[in-house]
Amino acid sequence: MAHNTVADMSGFELGMPALVCRWRIYNRHLPLANRHLRALLARQVQGKPLTKELVAWAKQHIEWTLEQGAVEYPQGVLMLILDTEGRAAMTVGPFEPLEDTRLDYLIHRAEKAQVEAAQTHIAPETLWLARNDMLLWDQGDLCVPSGASSLVAQLAQTMGIRVQPYQGLLDGVATGALTYDEAFLVSDEFGIVPASDRRGSHGVRMAQGYQRLIERA
């Protein structure tokens, strides 16, 4: 059943944001567009699923928005904002890399994303760990993978790396109960970000493979 409606984009101001998606642009294109849209359809806002109408609107406006905004920011970030009334807007802004890539900060970002996922069913950023030639990540009970996470899972499969869901991963890292070799953040906005103080070969390989796929998309 449709719960959200798409308002005419002309002549209105957005109200209180209920959802903000930030998707990385590469060379004036949105390489993970289909993955982002599938994840968007799985999201909920204020306990209600988004409609196919809204996702169709987003798909159409991605092209229009990139034609205009990506001229100024060809390597920028496309932002989709949905307010509490179900009205949507889309814009493009500059991309600014993470200045702090220490593990503690990446954990902090993953924790914030987990709070968002409890409400929307999608975590835009997740922490991944490498242990004994296997990747661990916590998708959450009710959540489906974000666009970036779904690509990383597929990329790992093509590399012959096993991916294992691990519930309570962030708590295990925080308490020291979980042993691991390296860590990296997977983000719809920032891609794969290896922790500067827990960097390793798996994260580097994944980041390189991710970048190659983005460049070819």
Regions found by a protein language model. Give the residues of each.
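Short, contiguous acidic and Ser/Thr-rich linear segments
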Residues: 136-146
